[in-house]
């Protein structure tokens, strides 16, 4: 039986692409109609590796900002930017993140979920940075601070399944009693399944599963479907997912 519903943050609770594009478009000086989706997806794919290199000391935060952005631009055959431009993007991106909002329907679903389940968050990134997003999204209405686990706190980062085990100990629950909701197949779905959790894939970017080793327990493709899935959990007398 499911007793806890735990969420990823970036591009799961809110649309991460919108602030990314708003910050990057003026830097690369492309028409507003230009689709930067491949650059955004490449930027996200590098998140775990970039974070690991900073925490290990092999990259400075400045070096990460430059290398990560230029690698993402290269993935879309766009020219690299100068270090100054990369840092300007990073500053603009942080400003844009101050305006993030929950995906439509999530607040109503969280209201209902809180009545029946423990709620939590597992997120990669520096604790202060991720908690700032959580506060802007007003997630403290539904989730206690001790049920929010960052990779910096855990000393582990997704896709390491051990971060999910750490959360189980924090919530005093078994893996089989936990479900994780996330947008990234490798970081969220595969990692959660490897830890023995159920996994709900919020595949609103319409991505393909890169391998067939781990199948999500449920897949939804837009915020309305995610709301319906979460509300369905609140109507069950015994979890059947």
Residue ranges and their predicted role:
Residues 60, 100, 121, 179-180:
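Residue-level marker of alpha-helix boundaries and capping positions
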Residues 2-9, 13-104:
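N-terminal helical cap/lid subdomain that shapes the substrate entry/recognition surface
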Residues 18-22, 104-108, 132, 161-162:
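Generic recognition of short, well-ordered alpha-helical segments
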């Amino acid at each position: 039986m499911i007793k806890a519903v735990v969420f990823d943050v970036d591009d799961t609770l809110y649309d991460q692409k919108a602030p990314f594009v708003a910050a990057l478009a003026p830097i690369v000086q492309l028409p507003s109609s230009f689709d930067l989706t491949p650059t955004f997806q490449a930027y996200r794919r590098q998140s775990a590796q970039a974070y690991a290199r900073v925490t290990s000391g092999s990259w400075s935060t400045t070096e990460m900002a430059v290398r990560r952005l230029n690698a993402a631009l290269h993935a879309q055959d766009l020219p690299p930017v100068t270090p100054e431009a990369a840092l300007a993007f990073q500053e603009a991106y942080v400003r844009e993140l101050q305006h993030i909002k929950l995906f439509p329907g999530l607040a109503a679903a969280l209201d209902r979920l809180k009545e029946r389940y423990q709620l939590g968050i597992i997120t990669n990134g520096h604790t202060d940075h991720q908690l700032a997003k959580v506060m802007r999204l007003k997630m403290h209405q539904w989730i206690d601070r001790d049920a929010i686990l960052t990779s910096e706190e855990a000393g582990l980062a997704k896709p390491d399944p051990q971060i999910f085990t750490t959360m189980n100990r924090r919530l005093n629950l078994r893996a089989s009693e936990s479900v994780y909701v996330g947008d990234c197949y490798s970081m969220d779905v595969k990692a959660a399944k490897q830890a023995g959790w159920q996994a709900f894939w919020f595949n609103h970017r319409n991505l393909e599963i890169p391998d067939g080793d781990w199948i999500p327990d449920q897949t939804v493709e837009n915020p309305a479907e995610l709301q319906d899935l979460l509300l369905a959990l609140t109507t069950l007398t015994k979890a059947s997912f």
